[in-house]
Amino acid sequence: MPLLLLSALLPFSLMAGPTPSTGKELSAASFLQDILQRYGENESLSMPQLQSLLENLEVGKGGGNQRNMSQCLSSSTLFAAHNLTSGSVVDAEGFQSFCPTILQQLETRACQESPAFQNETTPGAEGRPSPGEVWGYGFLCVTVISLCSLFGAGVVPFMKKACYKRLLLFCIALAIGTLFSNALFQLIPEAFGFNPLEDSYVFTSSVIFGGFYLFFFTEKVLKMMLKQKHEHGHSHYSADTSKRDAEEGVTEKLQNGDLDHMIPPPHGSESDLRGDEKAVQQQDLPGQQSSCYWLKGIRYSDIGTLAWMITLSDGLHNFIDGLAIGASFTVSVFQGVSTSIAILCEEFPHELGDFVILLNAGMSIPQALFFNFLSACCCYLGLAFGILAGSHFSSNWIFALAGGMFLYIALSDMFPEMNEVSKEDEEGGRAFSAFMIQNAGLLTGFAIMLLLTTFSGQIQLG
């Protein structure tokens, strides 16, 4: 049946004649004539017209990808190679001799922009999240992080339990692992314009973490061995350690969870001392009496200066955290979620420690919750600035700033805090258990960021 239909239609197709063409029969010269007609006049090209052709082909920019062996030549260099001056006119024959030069520059991709340059100069590249996704996911993550400031009141009854100290030690080690790894795997490479799917830097970043972990492991093992060797000798810790920690305030509270040890008032005034005693006594009151006390509150004049210093510094810290989150979400939802996870792991022990300090400085529990949450809300302000800066300017500088901040917090702030929290276990003969908890937290944080970076191409968010 199809053959019969085809044989019936064949005579009509032959009668219709050949398919109309747009002009002359197609030949090799047709392509050359088409170029000369579209870019030139009278089947010839002037130098500005030839320059326009090179710009459309992205050839002749001079100074392209330095990784390629072939050099990206400027248009003036290409013209000089063919003895062309500013007043020259290229006819069909001259353009045929010029074509191999264009073909060589295109084939070697010498003038192709590097991924880092494209990432920095094309902020509206395809694949970036929409403004609704950026603001929506950003506010969601910041809200979850800010709620960590309210968890402090829930753990107050457990602060004298042994499990609290071990949980706090694990959380601090987890924060170090996630912050350090997030800076190595995502923030710093993003600042340089690297892509984990194209640039093989993940293994190199893992080696950097390996060097850090190797020295940490060696130092801890050597200390445990030397302590066992000299356990009957002199003590390495002075007798006034607790007094020194009382003056410093922060590490003592995180280590012992002891709200009975108060920070001395700044001027020794009776009102400050009375306010501090009330802050401690409220922890030992029965449930109903404590509730009535919360409703009274404490006069702001009775609150120590340390509380206001902690609130202001924590607000600035949270602002920079929000800045990093906002800039990350402008790049991709995945990048923003990864940065938020690292900050969340750091915020839980940090906000818990701040809550204890505010109580010891003379605040009531409602006041400590309010000001701790108020400083946490500064993260929203940083988020807005980060989104606006990342949407209209290059976010590489924000990633560089956040990467340096994460490294400082992890190594200079959280790491000594982890050592202070584990000091009691080390002095009490439980150094090995504390060492294992530290290892579990560090390696867990590292593994989370490594897996997120390695499988970033398979994880679809937004």
Curated annotation (Swiss-Prot):
Pfam families xref list: Zip
Example of a GO MF term: monoatomic anion:monoatomic cation symporter activity
Keywords: Cell membrane, Endosome, Glycoprotein, Ion transport, Lysosome, Membrane, Signal, Transmembrane, Transmembrane helix, Transport, Zinc, Zinc transport
Lineage: Eukaryota, Metazoa, Chordata, Craniata, Vertebrata
Gene that specifies this protein: slc39a14
Signal peptide, first to last residue: 1-16
Cytoplasmic membrane side: 160-167, 223-322, 389-396, 453-462
Species of provenance: Xenopus tropicalis (Western clawed frog)
Protein name listed in UniProt: Metal cation symporter ZIP14
UniProt GO BP: cellular response to glucose stimulus; cellular response to insulin stimulus; import across plasma membrane; inorganic cation transmembrane transport; intracellular zinc ion homeostasis; iron import into cell; iron ion transmembrane transport; manganese ion homeostasis
Predominant location category: membrane
Subcellular location: Cell membrane; Apical cell membrane; Basolateral cell membrane; Early endosome membrane
UniProt region (Disordered), positions on chain: 235-285
